[in-house]
């Protein structure tokens, strides 16, 4: 067992609750001790929605431990069924309450006798899966449940829609810029003359799941959520799916060409090449910007990328292929899908890191000293400590990455947003230098940022003054090189002589 003060992907029950609370009129009952029930607070704080989070905690306390949980859990399910009239109630334990080894499936069967809506137990192993895997499995389970139910009743649609249509699978609550991506994907589909049949799970009704087979194909924009469902629909109903994430000019074009291929295979005659050309050359600013002098200033600059599989792979490709930036390290915390990630990014970066240990990533960033980091909220903290700018490109994220303004990452507008984020993340050296020289408005003294948060070396007055004369955008590097030299030679105080010796040693 490992103590972690930062987790990139949460425990399994968070994934299940994300799916349940994404659907319309679905309620979740969480069988958990106090302390595991933070999902309501987290979602209410982060998602900018007016509705309450439809999750109730059935608390495991000493009375429950003494008498067993059945009575309390069944009562809570039946009570919520009467109060809220949900279409579906999903019961989920947490990793803590799983220790009790109770027969929750039996509780669900018992509650179903008295409940008017459907009741389901989330079928997830809480010790084997994390938040992302559990979300994928829960979505698959709900879709399968309702399609099988419709099949028994003979309610499945027998024909496809007349016009080409798509199901967008994987848009969920608490996802990284998911709502914005959904809007952009709907626009993209409209531009291509494709109707959106269903978007699941966000805002979907479980009663509409029976309509999923009407679509011509499925689009899975995020690798973490939706692949299991798309695989099931392909196996049962012969529905093809596109799992190319449309992020960046190149990948968006590849995604559209794959859609064209699937639609034409079903009898339509579409040609999207003119649309791709028009968008790439004239509508999206990213292709033009990447050839401008501003972007050429970034050529060869070093960057580190870290995040979930989808976003880390997409950003790595954009940096290397479309902007000429040198990616020294690309990493993901999705260890369960590491082979796919390696295959996607290995030709675009020097080093691949598969880890969910934030200290390992922090150490790698400190060792590589990139000009910018593109990562999660945690890499932002690391960047602040090391004085390296960071653009946030993947979950886990905090409130500032749930923007009110329109900021998609997918599609052609997404490429503009990503390009802005990348360019603005690199510190413009001259700007930094001028601020230091002139001190800005009403600044009494120049503020110097220390790089080492816990440096064990002392700088004497003369050496500190000399260090302050070094331009801000290289000062961090000079300080780190000098301290490294001092440690290797056994100096505890850094003087001017030590500084000059260090400078000679690194050949600067």
From Swiss-Prot:
One Pfam family in the UniProt entry: Oxidored_nitro
Highest taxon of the lineage: Bacteria
SUPFAM superfamilies: Helical backbone' metal receptor
EC number: 1.3.7.7
Keywords for the protein's UniProt record, in alphabetical order: 4Fe-4S, ATP-binding, Chlorophyll biosynthesis, Iron, Iron-sulfur, Metal-binding, Nucleotide-binding, Oxidoreductase, Photosynthesis
Presence of the UniProt keyword Plastid in the record: no
NCBIfam families with a match to the protein in the record: DPOR_BchB (TIGR01278)
Listed name of the protein: Light-independent protochlorophyllide reductase subunit B
Organism: Rippkaea orientalis (strain PCC 8801 / RF-1)
Designated gene of the protein: chlB
């Amino acid at each position: 067992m490992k103590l972690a003060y930062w987790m990139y992907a949460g425990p399994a029950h968070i994934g299940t609750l994300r799916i349940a609370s994404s659907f319309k009129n679905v309620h979740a009952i969480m069988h958990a001790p106090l302390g595991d029930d933070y999902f309501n607070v987290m979602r209410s704080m982060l998602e900018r929605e007016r509705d309450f989070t439809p999750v109730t905690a059935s608390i495991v306390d000493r009375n429950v431990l003494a008498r067993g949980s059945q009575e309390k859990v069944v009562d809570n399910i039946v009570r919520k069924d009467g109060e809220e009239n949900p279409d579906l109630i999903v019961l989920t334990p947490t990793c803590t309450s799983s220790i009790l080894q109770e027969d929750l499936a039996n509780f669900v069967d018992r509650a179903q006798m008295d409940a008017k809506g459907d009741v389901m137990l989330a079928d997830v192993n809480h010790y084997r899966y994390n938040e992302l895997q559990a979300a994928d499995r829960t979505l698959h389970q709900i879709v399968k449940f309702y399609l099988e139910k419709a099949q028994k009743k003979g309610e499945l649609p027998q024909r496809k829609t007349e016009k080409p249509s798509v199901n967008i699978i994987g848009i969920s609550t608490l996802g990284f810029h998911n709502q914005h991506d959904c809007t952009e994907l709907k626009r993209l589909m409209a531009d291509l003359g494709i109707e959106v049949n269903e978007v699941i799970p966000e805002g979907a009704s479980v009663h509409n799941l029976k309509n999923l087979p009407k679509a011509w194909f499925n689009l899975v924009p995020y690798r973490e959520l939706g692949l299991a469902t798309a695989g099931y629909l392909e196996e049962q109903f012969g529905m093809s799916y596109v799992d190319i994430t449309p992020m960046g000019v190149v990948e968006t074009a590849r995604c559209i060409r794959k859609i064209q291929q699937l639609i034409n295979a079903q009898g339509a005659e579409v040609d999207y090449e003119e649309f791709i050309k028009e968008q790439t050359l004239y509508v999206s600013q990213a292709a033009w910007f990447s050839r401008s002098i501003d972007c050429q200033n970034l050529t060869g600059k070093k960057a580190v990328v870290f995040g979930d599989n989808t976003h880390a792979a997409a950003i790595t490709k954009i940096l290397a292929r479309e902007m000429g930036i040198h990616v020294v390290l690309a990493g993901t915390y999705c260890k369960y899908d590491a082979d796919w990630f390696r295959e996607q990014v290995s030709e675009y970066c020097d080093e691949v890191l598969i880890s969910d240990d934030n200290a390992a990533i922090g150490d790698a960033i400190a060792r590589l000293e990139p000009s910018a980091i593109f990562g999660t909220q945690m890499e932002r903290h690391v960047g602040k400590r090391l004085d390296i700018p960071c653009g946030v490109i993947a979950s886990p994220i905090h409130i500032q990455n749930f923007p009110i303004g329109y900021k998609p990452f997918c599609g052609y507008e997404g490429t503009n947003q990503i390009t802005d984020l990348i360019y603005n993340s690199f510190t413009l050296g001259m700007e930094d230098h001028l601020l230091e020289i002139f001190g800005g408005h009403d600044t009494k003294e120049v503020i110097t940022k220390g790089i080492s948060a816990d440096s064990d070396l002392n700088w004497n007055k003369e050496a500190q003054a000399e260090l302050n004369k070094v331009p801000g955008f290289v000062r961090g590097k000079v300080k780190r090189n000098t301290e490294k030299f001092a440690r290797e030679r056994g100096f505890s105080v850094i003087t001017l002589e030590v500084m000059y010796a260090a400078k000679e040693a690194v050949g600067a």
